[in-house]
């Protein structure tokens, strides 16, 4: 048994963990105070003994928050996050496909003019992805009210609805 701590920013908060199909664990976390001071999405991989294999931060130029991620296959993962612009009070869902080495395969953003956020993502049987979250950019004209938001993508992260 073991206990470890990891960090790349001033404050790091673990948010999700998956067992890697190649052994060890993948951890997604929120990073505060890294780079230009914005919040970023952190991802790290450790072995079964808790030794760090690699650690990366994504985002950096805009505030981001990690939400959830899922295993796609033995060496790929899908993560849903939010990109937040506090000056315009808006946000977009941010979908990132990552390989086992923490390299981004592709990334897509979804949303319009208001607050759109993805909270959960799973792979679908047709090799695409489905995201659920919240939106006040759709039919709703009240910026203080949100609708349940569901978005389906193809295997490359494209959606005909956004």
Residue ranges and their predicted role:
Residues 1-162:
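A sequence-level/structural motif corresponding to short, flexible coil/turn segments enriched
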């Amino acid at each position: 048994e073991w206990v470890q701590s990891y960090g790349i920013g001033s404050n790091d908060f673990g948010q999700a963990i998956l067992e890697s199909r190649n052994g060890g664990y993948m951890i997604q976390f929120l990073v505060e105070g890294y780079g230009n001071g914005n919040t970023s999405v952190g991802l790290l991989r450790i072995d079964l003994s808790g030794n760090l294999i690699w650690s990366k931060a994504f985002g950096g130029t805009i505030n981001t928050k990690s939400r959830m991620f899922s295993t796609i296959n033995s060496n790929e993962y899908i993560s849903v996050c939010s990109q937040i612009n506090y000056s315009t009070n808006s946000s977009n869902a941010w979908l990132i496909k990552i390989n086992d080495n923490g390299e981004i395969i592709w990334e897509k953003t979804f949303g319009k003019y208001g607050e759109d956020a993805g909270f959960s993502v799973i792979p679908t049987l047709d090799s695409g992805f489905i995201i659920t979250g919240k939106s006040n950019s759709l039919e709703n004209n009240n910026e203080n009210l949100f609708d349940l938001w569901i978005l389906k993508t193809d295997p490359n992260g494209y959606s005909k609805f956004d």
